[in-house]
Amino acid sequence: MEESEDLRRATELWRAAYRYQMEGELDRAIEHYQRSVAVHPTAEAHTFLGWSLSFQGRLEEATAECLRAIEIDPDFGNPYNDIGVYLMQQGKLDEAIPWLGKAKQARRYEPRQFPFMNLGRVYLKQGRWWDALREFEGAVQTAPGDVHAAKTLHQLRGQLN
């Protein structure tokens, strides 16, 4: 019973942290995420803590939080995608590819199209146009209502024709 109460409290804390993060209050968000993982570590809290840290340019710490999230729940796809994005931000495109691939394969991931979009961006930067096209097609197939994904796919098709 105590563990479920801890999990409930930890979830409340990371949800509050997420709200602070969306309002741009990063320090307050980070504090709440840290309190959440102190009560009961969850993959979500570690991932979102990493995300907040990344907005402060603290990419090594952000990556470490994502690795902790993966240890807790290897089926949660968000930390794989986030590590891929942090590597992209550092110009480490080849290193980002396997992380984004793992995010695509994860059982639990929302929004599902993000790793496809990010992998497509990697391939564009590498000049791998047809690989990028396949990824953007995968993004649109995964999330047909995503206007940004559809627009990106349309633009790339136009450039390739």
Describe the role of every protein-language-model region.
Residues 45-46, 79, 113-115, 149:
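TPR alpha-solenoid repeat register
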Residues 1-6, 10, 121, 125, ...:
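Terminal, low-structured helical/coil segments at or just beyond the last alpha-helical repeat
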Residues 22-32, 56-68, 90-105, 114, ...:
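Structural signature of tandem alpha-helical TPR/SEL1-like repeats
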Residues 9, 42-43, 76, 112, ...:
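Residue-level recognition of tetratricopeptide repeat
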Residues 6-44, 48, 55:
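Alpha-helical segment of the N-proximal tetratricopeptide repeat
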Residues 38-39, 72, 106-108, 142:
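Structural marker of alpha-solenoid helical repeat scaffolds
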